[in-house]
């Protein structure tokens, strides 16, 4: 049954950390996908399963935020902004572990797709802030979607949102290395040279500056 499947997914929170890390990017979205299921028992199982992942979080800063993160995942319209603010205001001194990232990433995705430029800006800021706090292996499964979302924010009409998105992209490239972004610089240069994309060129110019700053000035050679 769907309920049994969700409970099984929740039990995977107690896997060996290495096994869990490899599976989180698949497990958590499946649980989130049935949080609003038409069947009450399935919703309850999904809620309980998600809480299990909150229980295995090792980052003490995120542990304190688990209640608001879970509320934002369950009712994004109502709580996303509050969760983003809580993440921005938190001073992290420990690495963000896989289970922490699995919860945070859903808040970021929701913020990136919000109609408010300010909400997108907050989501981008969190991406930039967390880049140095996350193990590369934990971030890789989410990377392509994050890049796509940040690049959309880079062409937002609001300058502050564009600038924050550009900084987030620069932080990701600096943390993960150019090899993870093989076509990024050529793509940004193509946009800069395309006179038909005047609205996108500002964002691309800012992003290119941040990326080159992250990689080092030798990239200008």
Regions from the PLM with identified roles:
Residues 5-16, 34-35, 49-57, 73, ...:
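Hydrophobic residues within the alpha-helices of tandem HEAT/HEAT-like
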Residues 38-39, 73-77, 115-116, 157-158, ...:
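Short inter-helical turns and helix N-cap capping residues of alpha-solenoid HEAT/ARM repeat scaffolds
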Residues 20-35, 59-74, 98-112, 138-154, ...:
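HEAT/HEAT-like alpha-solenoid repeats
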Residues 87, 197-199:
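Acidic, Ser/Thr- and Gly/Pro-rich intrinsically disordered linkers and low-complexity segments
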Residues 2, 43, 80-81, 120, ...:
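Residue-level detector of extended alpha-helical repeat arrays and alpha-solenoid scaffolds
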């Amino acid at each position: 049954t769907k309920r049994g499947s969700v409970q099984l997914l929740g039990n995977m929170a107690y896997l060996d950390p290495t096994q869990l890390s490899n599976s989180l990017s698949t497990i958590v979205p499946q649980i989130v996908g049935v949080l609003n299921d038409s069947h009450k028992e399935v919703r309850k199982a999904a809620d309980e399963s998600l809480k299990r992942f909150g229980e295995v979080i090792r980052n003490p800063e995120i542990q304190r935020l688990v209640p608001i993160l879970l509320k934002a995942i369950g009712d994004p319209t109502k709580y996303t902004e509050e969760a983003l603010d809580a993440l921005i205001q938190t001073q992290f001194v420990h690495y963000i572990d896989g289970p922490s990232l699995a919860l945070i990433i859903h808040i970021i995705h929701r913020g990136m797709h919000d109609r408010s430029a300010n909400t997108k800006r907050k989501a981008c800021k969190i991406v930039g802030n967390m880049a140095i706090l996350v193990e590369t292996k934990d971030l890789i499964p989410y990377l392509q979607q994050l890049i796509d979302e940040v690049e959309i924010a880079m062409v937002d009409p609001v300058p502050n949102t564009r600038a924050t998105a550009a900084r987030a992209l620069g932080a990701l490239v600096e943390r993960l290395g150019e090899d993870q972004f093989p076509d990024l610089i050529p793509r940004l240069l193509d946009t800069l040279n395309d006179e038909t994309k005047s609205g996108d060129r500002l964002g691309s110019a800012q992003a290119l500056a941040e990326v080159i700053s992250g990689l080092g000035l030798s990239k200008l050679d």
